[in-house]
Amino acid sequence: MGQQGQSGTSAGNPDSLKQDKISKSGDSLTTQDGNATGQQEATNYTNLPPNLTPTADWPNALSFTNKNNAHRAQLFLRGLLGSIPVLVNRSGSDSNKFQATDQKWSYTDLQSDQTKLNLPAYGEVNGLLNPALVETYFGNTRAGGSGSNTTSSPGIGFKIPEQNNDSKATLITPGLAWTPQDVGNLVVSGTSLSFQLGGWLVSFTDFIKPRAGYLGLQLSGLDASDSDQRELIWAKRPWAAFRGSWVNRLGRVESVWDLKGVWADQAQLAAQAATSEASGSALAPHPNALAFQVSVVEASAYSSSTSSSGSGSSSNTSPYLHLIKPKKVESTTQLDQGLKNLLDPNQVRTKLRQSFGTDHSTQPQSLKTTTPVFGTSSGNIGSVLSGGGAGGGSSGSGQSGVDLSPVERVSGH
């Protein structure tokens, strides 16, 4: 039970992952494999702290080659989703909108005050409270660091740092501890991975055998019939920021991101655009931060704001990433209900099926030949978690055929 470090399949390395040996400078790595007799090809990661031990072959280790390996799925999702904090903020006037002190992180924090339920109030994943937080801004963007909330043109997007609100949106980690139980409709198809996260469908492409750490990320609105639902590419070259993953002593996968490459792309774009002037140097490097390319497709969302005197203002040039653009609403209550409907698990599943053109199918047509990582049907983790398995028949907690226990408890087989 308590053995660790003696076996290659300990909690710290449940998949017997090969590891790199890192020099003290952090930039000279050679592959090591205790069972290997031949020379292994070196895997090079730059800018890694010397005390980190990344996997020598992270794409292979986290590629779901064995699609029924729940431990591997957990490692990947914990490492990936653990670095994506998102915030859901309520709309309203200054006196009615959520302040930082109002942001509740769990259902128990809310006590009986449902009006401050600003996280899972807008959506659950397979019946579980969704700990995601996605900060929302309405109407005016974050120009000058003080955008106002209106309910006439709502949109969900990433927060722009106060100190650099004219450049890009960033997510600073570590965020909430995402687990596979928070994710639905997880499927692997060819060289891509897709899963449902709240009201979004997140897809990772070309990650099975990426080139030098390539990781293509894209976020799509679930309503494919709505012209306002646009695909968003997370950073122009996300692989320029990735520096490697490793398994820590608790059995969790952690990742290092260096934003200099992404910043360079955005600085180049900024130099070519008259509406943006900030460079990446305005943001301090953070080993676990992930920058996002500014979206400029919603031109109408960046129209000049109008002051109380009626004169136009051209200060509304701050970049603002639209993830989901709900229908126009006229009141806070209507917006709240719209967001609840948008992120409702049943709505999400319906829209997923619609987006793949199979309204009456239990699984998207293009995914019918794939095998979801959890369970044997269309990825409804709720029944698996309850012990019913994919078919929902059995009642024992071990009957689902998939081990969903935390990674820390992996015993080595």
From Swiss-Prot:
Disulfide bonds: none annotated. Coiled coil: none annotated. Signal peptide: none annotated. InterPro entries: Adhesin_P1_C. Residues 1-60, 355-413 are annotated as: Disordered. Residues 1-13, 25-54, 355-376 have a biased composition (Polar residues). Residues 385-399 have a biased composition (Gly residues). Belongs to the adhesin P1 family. This is Putative adhesin P1-like protein MPN_144.
